[in-house]
Each structure stands twice: as C-alpha cells, then as structure tokens.
Amino acid sequence: MFIMRYIGPVCRLCRKEGEKLFLKGDRCTSQKCAILRKNYAPGMHAGKKAFGKQSEFSRQLREKQKAKRIFQVSESQMAKYYTMATKKHGVTGTIFLQYIERRLDNVVYRCGFAKSRRQARIFVSHGLIKVNGKKCTIPSRIVKVEDKISVNRKTKGVKVLEGLEKQKDYSPKWLKTDLAKGEAMVAFMPDKDDMEKSINSQSIVEFYSK
C-alpha cells in the first residue's frame, strides 16, 4: 500500500508546532534554526494568535501530529502501534511509545549513527544498517531486546558514517552502544525516562480511544 509522506520543508513543521522537533540534525542546534529566526507559524496569517481557547480534542490532535512529525511516522502506523499497545498489559501510553522508540530508524538515530531520524531512515533504506548481522532495509522494523544493530561497512555509502568514533555517546541507557565499532545492542526495554520527553503519550491514547 502506498503511504503519503511529507516531502516539503521540514523547518515549517517545527514552526507549525511552535517548538524544535530536531528534524534536521546539527542545523537544529545552530543559529540557523527556523524557530530562532522565525518564531511564528508559517502561512499568510503568521504571527496571529489562534481564535479562542483550544479544545481538549485540539490538544490531543496536536500532540498526535507532533509525534508523527518527530518520529516521521505515518497515520496508519501510529494507529497500528496504538492497537498493538492496547493488547498488552501495562500503561497503554508507555507501551505505545516503546513501539515507536524501538523502530529501527529511531534506534539508529538514538545510537548516534545518524544526525536525525530522517537521515537514519535513509541509511536503513539504502542498506547501510544490519540487524543481527543481516542487512535490513525496513525503517519501521521493531527491534527486540538483545537485537544487535551495526553499521554495514561493506556498502559503498559507508563514508557517510565515518568518524563515529570521534562523537560523544549520547545514546539512552537501554541501548548499549559502541560508536568506535559502529555497533549497538538493545539491552532492555526503554522505560518512561528513556523515551521522547516532549510527547504526552496519554493525550495520544485519549485521541485514538474515542
């Protein structure tokens, strides 16, 4: 099934949400960041305040849209992760985020193998990443505990990944990462403190539960 993806200027997405979504790697932490230069929503009515107070539904919708943009996930995938989360024992919001956090493209980004989730998706799609020693080209693959993720150094595009050993390791504790070797392992399931803190998963759960 063909899935539509946003292919326009990603900086517009950050401006629309009114906060940094870190979609462009190093640019997001520089003075060139669109939020710093144009701290207002895009469009012909930019700078004007929204009319009236946001409803509960509007806040839930905005939270869902923000999560989609941060993780570069389609609507059908979001709904799928919610359905999967409701079938598990535990807090639905936490389980929902665990599924998204364990997507291969997100794990590649979290490990520090890519500067953004968008770049991580490209790396996976182009065969630059292995899972348990085998090349994987599916960005949405959900990795499991003890899965090993590594850089496929036999690919022609591996130069993009050179210099990993010079970077600082900012990976979360649930990922045991060796940047010098270009390897990582899922040590355990991510908990609430290790996942994306800018997302209110409860609001997303409430949106889909209606």
Q: At which residue positions do the language-model features occur?
A:
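Glycine- and Gly-Pro-enriched alpha-helical subdomains that act as flexible
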Residues: 127-130, 135-137
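Conserved, well-structured core segments that form or line functional sites
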Residues: 115
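Ferredoxin-like alpha/beta domains used as RNA- or RNAP-binding modules
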Residues: 1-111, 138-210
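Short, well-ordered loop/turn sites that connect or cap secondary structure elements
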Residues: 123-124, 143
